[in-house]
């Protein structure tokens, strides 16, 4: 059983593999927590293969949250309690601890599946005579409220807020705010129903 499967199983496996994964998570926590401007609750499970680096910002990961192998957390990022970030997902926030425009803010009990990308800035490209690489970025914060499920291979564009209790279907590209308790899908993502069961279209 892999580290990710062990996390998905609720960390309940009373075997040698379970012990090995718990030890691995402890090592991952210790490595990440000693980095500058990184605060991780001691109850978190962090794979040693995860990449956690605050760069010029700060990272906070709340009680009981998990970060799976090969997930990336960089820059200004806050993750609440009981949330999970699965393998190969990328969270990149911008700014500094004092200037949090461009931060990524994840609430409590949020599920982020594999290969999700959330970036707190977009490249500027207004001037066609100037290389895009030299035009800088436009920082805009991303907020994921509590109890949200983001399925695999989702892209969330800078400046978006995803409302509490929402579901983002696999492969969606979210370009605008998502209302609370809605289900969105598609490219660009649109509301296909509310969790109450009421279809919108």
Where are the language model's segments positioned?
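Beta-rich strand-turn-strand
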Residues: 153-165, 172-176
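Conserved G/P- and acidic residue-centered "switch" motifs that form tight phosphate/ATP-binding loops
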Residues: 168, 186
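Flexible, glycine/small-residue-enriched loop-and-beta-strand segment within the central core
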Residues: 50-61, 66-158, 187, 195-198
């Amino acid at each position: 059983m892999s580290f990710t499967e062990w996390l998905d199983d609720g960390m309940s496996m009373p075997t040698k593999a379970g012990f090995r994964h718990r030890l691995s998570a402890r090592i991952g926590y210790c490595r990440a927590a000693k980095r500058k401007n990184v605060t991780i609750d001691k109850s978190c499970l962090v794979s040693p293969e995860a990449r956690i680096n605050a760069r010029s910002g700060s990272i906070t990961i709340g009680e009981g949250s998990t970060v799976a192998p090969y997930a990336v957390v960089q820059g200004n990022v806050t993750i609440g309690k009981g949330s999970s970030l699965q393998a190969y997902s990328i969270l990149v926030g911008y700014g500094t601890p004092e200037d949090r425009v461009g931060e990524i803010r994840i609430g409590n009990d949020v599920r982020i599946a594999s290969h999700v990308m959330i970036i707190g800035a977009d490249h500027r490209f207004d001037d066609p005579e100037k290389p895009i690489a030299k035009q800088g970025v436009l920082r805009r914060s991303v907020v994921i409220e509590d109890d949200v499920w983001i399925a695999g291979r989702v892209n969330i564009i800078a400046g978006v807020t995803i409302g509490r209790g929402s579901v983002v279907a696999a492969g969606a590209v979210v370009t605008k705010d998502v209302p609370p308790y809605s289900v969105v899908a598609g490219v660009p993502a649109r509301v296909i129903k509310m969790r109450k069961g009421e279809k919108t279209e």
